């Protein structure tokens, strides 16, 4: 893989999760453009730099030796990528403090460097949290590849920070420069809430939760197929989002034990609040993680999963395949994985390569619900 070369450093970077023969690199032209701008403008060792949504540490690791850098992300995998890439390039893995997007920021910051996220609600929430956190004369610069830069991203920067000027495109990347101006403190529109009929519960959703304004149709198809009469089974909701699958299952299975995991900190925050709202102090494990990567082998009886098909702007089934592998490792012999997937994705064939028995539990015109037994 090519090195990320800037005036600050030459870095050998890897993506997360690591894959053999990885076809994609861990940085892009938007990272290079942003680093070039910072170098041309000038940076001092005592500058406080906040990096938002750094994919795998390309920005924070490049600047780590040249300023007081803090990184905030909603992605556990991105946070893990930063730590691994710092260590990979001769720095302490914790050389850059990490702040999950679910936690408040602590300024003042002289620079704010933003990679525009796929979910603009996350960007909006991050900009709202910047209120009162900018030092006098602070510079706020956002970057994206042109094909992933909606006009509304600039509108949000203008609304919450100040006037925006766009750069020329370089190598199909563009920068947005926002000049901070005094303005009234704004109240966040997040979290949002919606109500289900069956089960009859209200669900809270922080800004970066998938389908935060209503139940996604895949989960809607899976809900009626959740297993019942589980007794004291150990159940994991893999990629839990706001926790709806685990909560619905737990309401039907009062003696079962649940683990909810997601790589989004805001998803885990939402799931935690929803669990407490509907199940009180009932024991549960909730964690931001790389799926079931740290789950003990043969420690689960059931895994529930509505697998994602993209990582930011990268689309593919590599995350789903990784989840299937993790589920197989974590399940006891005879344990079962329940998933929902688009018909065209061919999950039945993929699961048949990993599990001894795969059956279709239900189907809609768009989705299939599958049960795979180890």
UniProtKB/Swiss-Prot annotation:
GO MF annotation list: 23S rRNA (guanine(1835)-N(2))-methyltransferase activity; nucleic acid binding
Function: Specifically methylates the guanine in position 1835 (m2G1835) of 23S rRNA.
UniProt catalytic activity: guanosine(1835) in 23S rRNA + S-adenosyl-L-methionine = N(2)-methylguanosine(1835) in 23S rRNA + S-adenosyl-L-homocysteine + H(+)
Name of protein: Ribosomal RNA large subunit methyltransferase G
Pfam family, any one: MTS
Main location (coarse class): cytoplasm
Record-linked InterPro entries: DNA_methylase_N6_adenine_CS, rRNA_m2G-MeTrfase_RlmG, RsmC/RlmG, SAM-dependent_MTases_sf, Small_mtfrase_dom
The organism of origin for this protein: Pseudomonas syringae pv. tomato (strain ATCC BAA-871 / DC3000)
Organism superkingdom: Bacteria
Family: Belongs to the methyltransferase superfamily. RlmG family.
Enzyme Commission number(s) of this protein: 2.1.1.174
Keyword S-adenosyl-L-methionine attributed: yes
SUPFAM superfamilies, per the entry: S-adenosyl-L-methionine-dependent methyltransferases
Keywords: Cytoplasm, Methyltransferase, rRNA processing, S-adenosyl-L-methionine, Transferase
Entry's localization field: Cytoplasm
Cellular component, GO, one term: cytoplasm
Biological classification of the source: Bacteria, Pseudomonadati, Pseudomonadota, Gammaproteobacteria, Pseudomonadales
């Amino acid at each position: 893989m090519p090195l990320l070369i800037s005036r600050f450093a030459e870095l050998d970077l890897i993506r997360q999760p690591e894959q053999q023969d990885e076809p994609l690199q861990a940085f892009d032209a938007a990272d290079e453009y942003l680093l070039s701008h910072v170098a041309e403008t000038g940076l001092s060792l005592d500058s406080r730099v906040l990096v938002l949504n750094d994919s795998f540490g390309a920005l924070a690791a490049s600047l780590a030796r040249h300023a007081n850098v803090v990184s905030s992300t909603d992605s556990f995998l991105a946070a893990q990528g930063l730590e691994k890439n710092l260590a990979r390039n001769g720095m302490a893995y914790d050389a850059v403090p990490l702040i999950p997007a679910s936690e408040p920021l602590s300024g003042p910051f002289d620079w704010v460097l933003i990679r525009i996220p796929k979910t603009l609600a996350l960007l909006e929430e991050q900009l709202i949290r910047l209120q009162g956190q900018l030092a006098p004369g602070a510079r706020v610069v956002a970057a994206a590849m042109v094909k992933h830069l909606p006009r509304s991203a600039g509108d949000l920067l203008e609304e919450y920070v100040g006037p925006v000027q766009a750069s020329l495109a370089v190598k199909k990347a563009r920068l947005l420069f926002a000049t901070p101006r005094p303005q009234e403190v704004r109240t966040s529109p997040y979290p949002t809430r919606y109500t289900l009929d069956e089960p009859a519960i209200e669900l809270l959703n922080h800004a970066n939760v998938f389908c935060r304004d209503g139940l996604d149709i895949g989960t809607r198809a899976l809900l009626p197929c959740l297993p019942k009469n589980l007794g004291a089974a150990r159940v994991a909701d893999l990629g839990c989002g706001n926790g709806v699958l685990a909560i619905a299952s737990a309401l039907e299975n009062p003696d079962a034990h649940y683990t909810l995991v997601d790589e989004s900190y805001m998803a885990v925050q939402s799931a935690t609040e929803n669990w407490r709202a509907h199940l009180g102090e009932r024991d549960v494990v909730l964690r931001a993680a790389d799926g079931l990567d740290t789950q003990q082998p043969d420690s689960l009886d059931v895994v529930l999963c509505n697998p994602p098909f993209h990582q930011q702007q990268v689309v593919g089934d590599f995350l789903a395949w990784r989840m299937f592998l993790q589920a197989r490792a974590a399940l006891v012999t005879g344990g079962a994985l329940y998933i929902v997937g688009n018909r065209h994705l061919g999950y039945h064939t993929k699961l048949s390569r990993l599990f001894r028995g795969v059956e279709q539990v239900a189907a809609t015109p768009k989705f299939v619900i599958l049960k795979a037994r180890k």
